[in-house]
Amino acid sequence: GSTLVPQIVHPGPESICGYRGIAPLGPSVNKNANGHVSRPISVEEIQTVVKQYGAAARRVEAAGCGGLGLHTAHAYMLPGSFLSPLRNKRMDEYGGTIDNRARFILEVIRECRKNLSPDFPIFLRVSGSERVEGGNSLQEMLYLAPKFEEAGVSLLEVSGGTQYEALEYILPAHGKQIGMNVYEASEIKKVVNIPVYAVGKINDVRYAADIVERGLVDGVSMGRPLLADPDLPNKAKAGLLDDITPCGSCDGSCVTRSSEKPQCKCHINPLVGKEYDYPELGKPAAKSKKLLVIGAGPGGMYAAMTAAERGHKVTIWEKDSIIGGQLNLAVRSPGKQEMCKWLMHLNYRCKKAGVEMVFNKEA
């Protein structure tokens, strides 16, 4: 099974006013994506929030979780906005210098550590570089990383960018470089004695294994690839790398749905959010049948693959001479070539399952 490590965070400037009438709080006056303006949090309120973090940490351990996650990346939410000079314009002990801007998150870390068992791990996500003029650079993180370790952090997750100015480093889409934050993570690893993980478009197990084996990082964090294939860790452990359904980093339904609608979806994996609706999938069919699928586009191939892997004898008729359907047009657009991985994977899985493909054949 998996270990649950919940990430606790005060939303700060990202608070939604319509939710229980909560007014956004921030280090300074800032406007969030909803147009709501935060008011500067007072020192007394800061001390209250720090205590609340400690109490929440205590509940995390009491609930039997395997660790505690904290977030101070992306100039985002309360800890991240305090740390970033892009958001923090205070003139008191919580603003100005890098030490003052880091004071809040360091107090949070120490308070959480005080409320946890000595060996209960604390994970901290940071931006290795905010990659924006006037934001925190790698040099600031190299200075702060040992301080985070000293305060009680057990593992650093290195992301990058900011929520508003450099989102592409947080959720790198197709067409963007794989492992965009690995360099920053590898540099931070040199100045601490705790594990350092890289975050951000690490959607290939072979690549992940390579950067770990070369000692660039101690591990990786994945999100979107586990939606495309929830069995990715098990398949990787078993050496079934070709069987892993590839994430195309399309940032489609997984990102937009999680922000706008309650149900997350995936363009690659149609079962995301519907796993309990189709309990028979993944299990052998009660009786093998002969099935004909019309069209070797992504939908037809996925249907054929699913049926064949359950034990049915499946044939695909495709009117053209190649697989792919409309996806062959889509991948011609700039930056969309990564979607070819999905098509190649479907072809591999169909062949492995024994699907017969007949080309230049109309129904």
List where the protein language model places each region.
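FAD-binding core/adjacent interface of flavoenzyme oxidoreductases
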Residues: 250-258, 353-363
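Beta1-alpha1 glycine-rich phosphate/pyrophosphate-binding loop at the start
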Residues: 293-360
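Flavin-dependent oxidoreductase catalytic cores
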Residues: 1-294, 298, 302-314, 322
